[in-house]
Amino acid sequence: MHFLSTSTHSHINEIKIMTYELSPGLTQVLAFCRKAMQEKALSDISTDCLLLGLLHDERSQAMQMLQSLSCPIEELKQQIMARLDSLQKSPLPSSEALVLSMESRRLLRLTLLEARRYGEEMANELHLLLAILHDSN
C-alpha cells in the first residue's frame, strides 16, 4: 500500500512514498479513511480519521477490545465526526494514494513498532489502537 505524506501546511510540500506490511483488516481501516477523507473533503488523513476507521468495523479485534473495556463507542464516533465536520474543507488530492498528516504517518510508524514489539510480521488494527493509546499518553 502506498501513502503520500504531506507537511502540516494545507498544500503538499513534500511527498514520500512508503510501503508498509499491513493486515487485510488494517488495509480496510485505511480504505475507510480514504473514503471518509474524500466524503468530508479533507486535505489529509488525520489521527481522528484513523480512529474512526478503527471504529467502523464492529467485528475487528480493536472494536472487540474497546467493547470489552466498556468504551462508549457511539459517543466516541459522534465526537470524532463532529471534529471532522468542523475542519476546513480542502480540494481533494488527485492521486488515489492516501494522503497522511504528519501525525498519522508517525502513528503508522508506531503501529509497525508495536507489531514488531509483539513479534508480528504484519501490523493489524490492534497495533494501530495500541499506537494511538501510547501516543495519547
List each language-model region with its residue ranges.
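Histone-fold recognition with a strong bias for associated Lys/Arg-rich disordered tails
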Residues: 2-137
